[in-house]
Amino acid sequence: MEVMVGSSFGIGMAAYVRDHRGVSAQDKAVQTALFLADESGRGGSQIGIGLRMSNNNNKSPEESSDSSSSIGESSENEEEEEEDDAVSCQRGTLDSFSSSLEDSLPIKRGLSNHYVGKSKSFGNLMEAASKAKDLEKVENPFNKRRRLVIANKLRRRGRSMSASNFYSWQNPNSMPLLALQEPNEEDHHIHNDDYEDDDGDGDDHRKIMMMMKNKKELMAQTRSCFCLSSLQEEDDGDGDDDEDE
């Protein structure tokens, strides 16, 4: 009994037989096989035993490359999805923060609801001019009357009260926009009478008038709008008086 190791295919078969998938028959067949030869006088009849293995272990290089590329693509897709989720979360937080910030701004709160949802963009100025009338808000007569009443009250209060009393000393931030002066008619008539009587003393009278005018300006100014220029003018007036004496 002899044991021989060889191929399961005969010599007459083609060395390379390919099926419709493009895989050779030798790749599918088992490379080793067992042959038993009987020497009992039959002239060496051979019995071939062939074993085939599954085709899962033997794959073409194209299939292996496709599987590896698919694995790489899946990992890349997962990374892109994670990045998209992170970006969407950041956008959501930024949008919520910006909306809350706009609501808290005084400009946003001061706008009227009449202009909500009416913002438009125009490429032609003629169209914007024609449609601007539609965006105009009709003034409420009650609000207009209220503003007029408040303005009249402030005007009457300003007439009845002097500048020094109207702007309190306790509030240093309150200051008039312009320097207010309240001329006194009685003092003006008295100075005119004195000027007519004393024609010879014109220079002295002018100096006295300038000093009186400077004192009135100082009295009209408040502590918050008290400036150094007024002090310098007062010092200059005192210096002139000392020189005359």
Curated annotation (Swiss-Prot):
Record carries keyword RNA-binding: no
GO biological process, alphabetically ordered: positive regulation of DNA-templated transcription; response to cadmium ion; response to oxidative stress
Keywords: Nucleus, Stress response, Transcription, Transcription regulation
Motif annotated as Nuclear localization signal, chain positions: 143-151
Region (Kinase-inducible domain (KID)): 203-230
Localization in the cell: Nucleus
Region (Disordered): 46-90
Gene Ontology CC annotations of this record: nucleus
Descriptive protein name: Protein OXIDATIVE STRESS 3 LIKE 6
Lineage, uppermost ranks: Eukaryota, Viridiplantae, Streptophyta, Embryophyta, Tracheophyta
The gene coding this protein: O3L6
